[in-house]
Amino acid sequence: QLSHHVLGIGDRAAQLTELGFHLKRGLLLYGPPGTGKTHTVRHLIAQAVEATVIVLSGEGLAMIEPATTLARRLTPSIVVVEDVDLIAQDRDYSPTGNPLLFSLLDAMDGVAADADVTFLLTTNRTAVLEDALVQRPGRVDLAVEIPRPDAAGRERLLRLYARDATLEADLTDAVARTDGVTASAIKELMRRAVLAALDGGGTT
């Protein structure tokens, strides 16, 4: 679904435009820290081999206007805004408002509907986001939760992060003990487990 929304629309740009549909799209990835939002963004970017990709995070968020101008000129393009809640808090939480919020809204609105531009936003805190960003059509078209992994997902992650280390065939206990744990935490747990085994004279 994510790849289709980000890449599929661009692949069918000519047909969609001819039929009167807009190309500009906004995608919001949300979920607790460490669940894999950034990894998902990287996966999408890796597939967009023909797109201009602009990533804004931290202090770089202040560059939203020139970044969007560049994205309009170099389509197809993807503008990634990481931790968008840093600049797009609801005005009830920040009565004075954040000038960058208005810059973001103006930048998104300034992109023509038929421009092959994707705004890819991430956040850990959907509750504080400005309604004008997430509820107005034409800004965020699709919001997708990146949740903590379920049991099957945790087992896959344990095996993935073990890399070449030898694991017991039955990971039932480890899967149960990691209930509610994020993907990044599982990666760190596996690193510590392998280190402990090596310190104890074991092999991998």
Question: What are these model-derived regions, one by one?
Answer:
Residues 147-203:
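Conserved C-terminal "switch" segment of AAA+ ATPases
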Residues 1-172:
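Walker A/P-loop NTP-binding motif of AAA+ ATPase domains
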